[in-house]
Amino acid sequence: MKIIHTADWHLGKILNGKQLLEDQAYILDMFVEKMKEEEPDIIVIAGDLYDTTYPSKDAIMLLEQAIGKLNLELRIPIIIISGNHDGKERLNYGASWFEHNQLFIRTDFTSINSPIEINGVNFYTLPYATVSEMKHYFEDDTIETHQQGITRCIETIAPEIDEDAVNILISHLTVQGGKTSDSERPLTIGTVESVQKGVFDIFDYVMLGHLHHPFSIEDDKIKYSGSLLQYSFSEAGQAKGYRRVTINDGIINDVFIPLKPLRQLEIISGEYNDVINEKVHVKNKDNYLHFKLKNMSHITDPMMSLKQIYPNTLALTNETFNYNEENNAIEISEKDDMSIIEMFYKHITDKELSDIQSKKIKNILENELRKED
């Protein structure tokens, strides 16, 4: 049996003001073409299909087109669960009749009680749920963390699980120790959101969504597919794609398959003048770029200048302020007020104070000293 594991499409994502629908349409077209080659028995999408609970019309159409090609044209069964970014009601609309085409949409965590059987494999679905939802359902005020809530959910099906069959869990959560990135919205506020690996011992394999790094954790049976695209500059350089999972005679193996995006996220560090004069290495001028540059404080609008050469510049950080704090603290402690101001101005502008500026500052300092006296 061949299973394709994917998650975290985040359709409709906007990165630093840039709409990523073109990039998402490109990668989904590539994914569909790959599925024609793979001919899987089933595709699993482990949550966060959309980036917001109220996706745009274009994002909805993009999902419909991709799912339509995979499920209706290629006749591939699909299991979808909701993630913390998805609107449950919208994602679940029409789910009952979609099942006639083997498109299974699960948005309620209680669906773990009704596994989906495909080719002798039991797929248990555990969509994203808040701690309060699980606490309310079980009528148990002692449930205060995701660890406690997820444990309780799994305990309800443990007595009924068929140990002679292959049992796979599909969920959307954070496993303790998993690598996170800036684009992952926290699952909870004020409580511990991670879940220990031991909770999943009764399953033969676990397919997860939420963390965007495909190798977020090192485990033989608990796996994240990672996101289809890089969605924050903390993910720059990360490979993105999907997992191919095979089951032969009860033995489960998986391999990560990378996909090449239309554009990647890239971080460029250096001197402003070197970047403007194209003396630094950039993999692709059309990539989404975050520049971290020094010696640019004298430039009126550096972002506009950068975009004339690198049109997809999305972020700019002034690195002029990066200096050794300990050494400077020692030096500053030995300086008078005027010298400190001169040093600070130099760090910000890379220039010396003019005579007029110095006189004005000295007058201000003298006036303040007289007030203290």
UniProtKB/Swiss-Prot annotation:
Keywords: DNA damage, DNA recombination, DNA repair, DNA replication, Endonuclease, Exonuclease, Hydrolase, Nuclease, SOS response
Keyword DNA damage: yes
One MF term in the entry's GO annotations: endonuclease activity
InterPro entries hit by this protein: Calcineurin-like_PHP_ApaH (IPR004843), DNA_Repair-Maintenance_Comp (IPR050535), Metallo-depent_PP-like (IPR029052), Mre11_N (IPR041796), SbcCD_nuclease (IPR053381), SbcD (IPR004593), SbcD_C (IPR026843)
Domain of life (superkingdom): Bacteria
Protein's GO biological process: DNA recombination; DNA repair; DNA replication; SOS response
Induction: Induced by ciprofloxacin and up-regulated by LexA.
Protein family per UniProt: Belongs to the SbcD family.
Protein role: SbcCD cleaves DNA hairpin structures. These structures can inhibit DNA replication and are intermediates in certain DNA recombination reactions. The complex acts as a 3'->5' double strand exonuclease that can open hairpins. It also has a 5' single-strand endonuclease activity. Is probably part of the SOS regulon and involved in DNA recombination and repair.
Oligomer and partners: Heterodimer of SbcC and SbcD.
Protein name: Nuclease SbcCD subunit D
Organism name: Staphylococcus aureus (strain NCTC 8325 / PS 47)
